[in-house]
Curated annotation (Swiss-Prot):
GO terms for molecular function: netrin receptor activity. Keywords: Cell membrane, Cell projection, Developmental protein, Disulfide bond, Glycoprotein, Immunoglobulin domain, Membrane, Phosphoprotein, Receptor, Repeat, Signal, Synapse, Synaptosome, Transmembrane, Transmembrane helix. The gene is UNC5C. Belongs to the unc-5 family. It comes from Gallus gallus (Chicken). This is Netrin receptor UNC5C.
Length: 931
């Protein structure tokens, strides 16, 4: 009724006095008369209204200084609602579209001393009974209507609800037993209540504050997460829900952090316990590293080990019997002897005591004395001379033997040098020709190419894999060229054989292309085709490297308020920038840097880059690596093994990966094949010269990782070389089966062309392809036409993995001397925009995004919140990452923006929201003109 009256007054231009006297008062009288027993009350109501009202004074519309606030009735206590407006002659409350009787109003009027305007303040009291008597889907509400001579003003609606908090928790925490440093999740869903209950956690009846103890984290769903369980975290945990009505406690959940026992190191072996004969030695260990705690498992195994030992018994020595006395000597003595061998002392036994020799006089002291003879002196002199002569002869013989041995050793050195094929160091004599008994064998059916083998030979003896000098050399590259004829190739024809594999290159072309390599390597450092940069503030934006599949999404709010960052994203193409990989590992993405390093971000950015893996997680172990500055490459996270402390989240789509991170650095994705069924995608691209004035025509077959940047690099390289794309590139699934890649050419018109490859096919070794670390890997097929009048080449090229998949290219090339123009259908000429700043970078308008976040961030009892949104968008592989963010919905929408850039599939998003029952958001999308 009030709305109709006000509308009438506004349309007719009537004063408020006339409106109240002619319309409002009679209507109120009729309403009063319709209620029995209320006549006297209505008379009082009319008497209290003023007799006259001022008409059309120059006053403004009423302005509310105080508007009614939402209130909750606790138990049976009524609540008061207040309104205050100026200038206002009257203020009345309207509750649930019905006017509140004047007698229920408490009115206070005064005149503002400063402005001279009437200030009116009114309050009413709402009881529990009034709220309970209301029927219908809408809650009990009241609003104020203020009058002045200029018109009426309505306040906002204030809802009055009966506060309550149910006793039963919807989900209570459960006790757990966990090992040390394990992540613990305690779930809690508070009981239903109005207003919504606040949740806190108690540990042994003390409130947990995650700010003080960062090992605890309370999610937006009220769950408690213990990041790494400690022994001190063994306690009783209680979930507490409270509002203005009551405080409820859940059942206590006991968390026990146990420690499994671990063995200490073994002690040294003890000495053998037997001093003589068989015994044993032992060593021990204890279950104290660590000792089991809180029910942890005891160490498995024995704590004592014993081994048999044998200690030899000591044997004391004993004398043998004395020998017979010797004959009487010239000095009138004779002697006898004995030995300590019956038995000899062993194993530490005692030695014999006493004399070994015993002598005594054999003539009873009657011994003759003879004068010295001069013959004895001559005898002694002769003996000395003989000894000296023997020593001299020995020295001469020794010198002769030494010289003979030295000469033979020198001959051995000369002989060994002959085995080097004639490449002797300086100052060493040439080898004797008679030592080259066996000539080199040139009858093998395969010719091998290895870079280091030909370091001392002429360049013409090499069998190159490619004739393109602009490409970086491939170290230790080996290619087998299989000859079907099996004929022996003479040594003097080796140079001609190698020249048949690739065309001759003039010296001037070689020098020019070498110069191009140098210029290109310098240009790569600042190549704008590999880098995008821009200046961003808190509004965010998007950096895109055209035609490379690499971009960086900076969400709104990622850059702190009030700061401006010069940000960039770049692709590194130098092989030295790539992470080292092991035999079974492969590089799946380009190496991408984003910066500036160390920049403070308040929410994750999304780094997007193409990958070449067939993402079957049963066959792969995929991990993200990063490099800080010039330091070593470090592991960040293994996909599928994330935990609460993981700093990044990886969304792996069929062709691209999206990395959510708050750390700007250098990143790359590395895969390790678990089974031989693991496969990576290769992009096969075939190029030929734009114009050809010679008889030779070269076809280059590139085998690249199936990423946009790898193909873009080759297209740029061929453009510089004057090459053209001969056929649409094709994809090949290359399995980790260790089988090589085989390339062959077929169906050549032999009357017009001949192949200069003296083999049936070429092969690229498996690991050269699988590692993903060799850029621009390719093979060259050289054909020769018999006449310059031949202007067309028709043939087939087959590329396949041995015992695997393959692709066939049907080539129909035009060969002419004049350039026909280069067409690169892969290069998107429209993709020149690299930087988008502000709201234009995002598909979802900011107001709708804010509305989505405010409605989906809060957990819902039916689950119609951000978790369902992640599930519907297939982004629910690891929900705990989003749960740790202040706005999980915002991070999910950031990831959706990166996935659907640049088209922005809003129709799909609207359909998902429609399924979730978010009709108002779908209507908002339609109103924005984006749906």
């Amino acid at each position: 009724m009030g709305k109709g009256l006000e509308g009438t007054a506004a349309r007719c231009g009537l004063g408020m006095g006339y409106l109240l006297h002619s319309v409002v008062l009679p209507a109120l009288a009729v309403l009063g008369a319709s209620r029995p027993g209320s006549a006297a009350q209505d008379d009082d109501f009319f008497h209290e209204l003023p007799e006259t009202f001022p008409s059309d004074p120059p006053e403004p519309l009423p302005h509310f200084l105080i508007e009614p606030e939402e209130a909750y009735i606790v138990k049976n206590k009524p609540v008061n609602l207040y309104c205050k407006a100026s200038p206002a002659t009257q203020i009345y409350f309207k509750c649930n579209s019905e006017w509140v009787h004047q007698k229920d109003h408490v009115v206070d009027e005064r005149v503002d001393e400063t402005s001279g305007l009437i200030v009116c303040e009114v309050s009413i009291e709402i009881s529990r009974q009034q709220v309970e008597e209301l029927f219908g889907p809408e809650d009990y509400w009241c609003q104020c209507v203020a009058w002045s001579s200029a018109g009426t003003t309505k306040s906002r609606k204030a809802y009055v609800r009966i506060a309550y908090l149910r006793k039963t928790f919807e989900q209570e925490p459960l006790g757990k037993e966990v090992s040390l440093e394990q992540e613990v999740l305690l779930q809690c869903r508070p009981p239903e209540g109005i207003p919504v209950a606040e949740v806190e956690w108690l540990k042994n009846e003390e409130v947990i504050d995650p700010v003080e103890d960062r090992n605890f984290y309370i999610t937006i769903d009220h769950n408690l997460i213990i990041k790494q369980a400690r022994l001190s975290d063994t306690a009783n945990y209680t979930c507490v829900a409270k509002n203005i009505v009551a405080k409820r406690k859940s059942t206590t959940a006991t968390v026990i952090v146990y420690v499994n026992g671990g063995w200490s190191t073994w002690t040294e072996w003890s000495a053998c316990n037997s001093r003589c004969g068989r015994g044993f030695q032992k060593r021990t260990r204890t279950c104290t590293n660590p000792a089991p705690l809180n029910g942890g498992a005891f160490c498995e195994g024995q704590n004592v080990q014993k081994i048999a030992c044998t200690t030899l018994c000591p044997v004391d020595g004993k004398w043998t019997s004395w020998s017979k006395w010797s004959t009487c000597g010239t000095e009138c003595t004779h002697w006898r002897r004995r030995e300590c061998t019956a038995p000899a002392p062993k194993n530490g036994g005692k030695d014999c005591e006493g004399l070994v020799l015993q002598s005594k006089n054999c003539t009873d002291g009657l011994c003759m004395q003879a004068a010295p003879d001069s013959d004895d002196v001559a005898l002694y002199v002769g003996i000395v001379i003989a000894v000296i002569v023997c020593l001299a002869i020995s020295v001469v013989v020794a010198l002769f033997v030494y010289r003979k041995n030295h000469r033979d050793f020198e001959s051995d050195i000369i002989d060994s040098s002959a085995l080097n094929g004639g490449f002797q160091p300086v100052n060493i004599k040439a080898a004797r020709q008679d030592l080259l008994a066996v000539p080199p064998d040139l009858t093998s059916a395969a010719a091998m190419y290895r870079g280091p083998v030909y370091a001392l030979h002429d360049v013409s003896d090499k069998i190159p894999m490619t004739n393109s000098p602009i490409l970086d050399p491939l170290p230790n590259l080996k290619i087998k060229v299989y000859n079907t004829s099996g004929a022996v190739t003479p040594q003097d024809e080796l140079s001609d054989f190698s020249s048949k594999l690739s065309p001759q290159i003039t010296q001037s072309l070689l020098e020019n292309e070498t110069l191009n390599v140098k210029n290109q390597s310098l240009a790569r450092q600042t190549d704008p085709s590999c880098t995008a940069f821009g200046t961003f503030n808190s509004l965010g934006g998007h950096l895109v490297i055209p035609n490379s599949g690499v971009s960086l999404l900076i969400p709104a709010g990622a850059v702190p308020q009030g700061r401006v960052y010069e940000m960039y994203v770049t692709v590194h193409r130098k092989e030295g920038m790539r992470p080292p990989v092991e035999d079974s590992q492969t590089l799946l993405t380009p190496v991408v840097s984003c910066g500036p390093p160390g920049a403070l971000l308040t929410r994750p950015v999304v780094l997007t880059m193409h990958h070449c893996a067939e993402p079957n997680m049963d066959d792969w172990q995929i991990q993200l690596k990063h490099q800080a500055g010039q330091g070593p490459w470090e592991d960040v996270v293994v996909v599928g093994e994330e935990n609460f402390t993981t700093p990044c989240y990886i969304q792996l789509d069929p062709e691209a990966c999206h990395i959510l991170t708050e750390t700007l650095s250098t990143y790359a994705l590395v895969g390790q094949s678990i089974t031989k069924a693991a496969a990576k995608r290769l992009k096969l691209a075939i190029f030929g010269p734009l114009s050809c004035s010679s008889l030779e025509y070269s076809i280059r077959v590139y085998c690249l990782d199936d990423t946009q940047d790898a193909l873009k690099e080759v297209l740029q390289l061929e453009r510089q070389m004057g090459g053209q794309l001969l056929e649409e590139p094709k994809t090949l699934h290359f399995k980790g089966s260790t089988h090589n890649l085989r390339l062959s050419i077929h169906d050549i018109a032999h009357s017009l062309w001949k192949s200069k490859l003296p083999a049936k096919y070429q092969e690229i070794p498996f690991y050269h392809i699988w590692s993903g670390c060799q850029r621009n890997l390719h093979c060259t097929f050289t054909l020769e036409r018999f006449s310059l009048n031949t202007l067309e080449l028709v043939c087939k090229l087959c590329v396949r993995q041995v015992e695997g998949e393959g692709q066939i290219f049907q080539l129909n090339c035009s060969v002419s001397e004049e350039p026909t123009g280069i067409d690169y259908p892969i290069m998107d000429s429209a993709g020149s925009i690299t930087t988008i700043v502000g709201p234009n970078a995002f598909s979802i308008p900011l107001p709708i995004r804010q509305k989505l976040c405010s409605s989906l961030d809060a957990p819902q009892t039916r689950g119609h919140d951000w978790r369902m949104l992640a599930h519907k968008l297939k982004l629910d592989r690891y929900l705990n990452y989003f749960a740790t963010k202040s706005s999980p919905t915002g991070v999910i929408l950031d990831l959706w923006e990166a996935q659907n850039f640049p088209d922005g599939n809003l129709s799909m998003l609207a359909a998902v929201l429609e399924e979730m029952g978010r009709h108002e958001t779908v209507v908002s999308l339609a109103a924005e003109g984006n749906y």
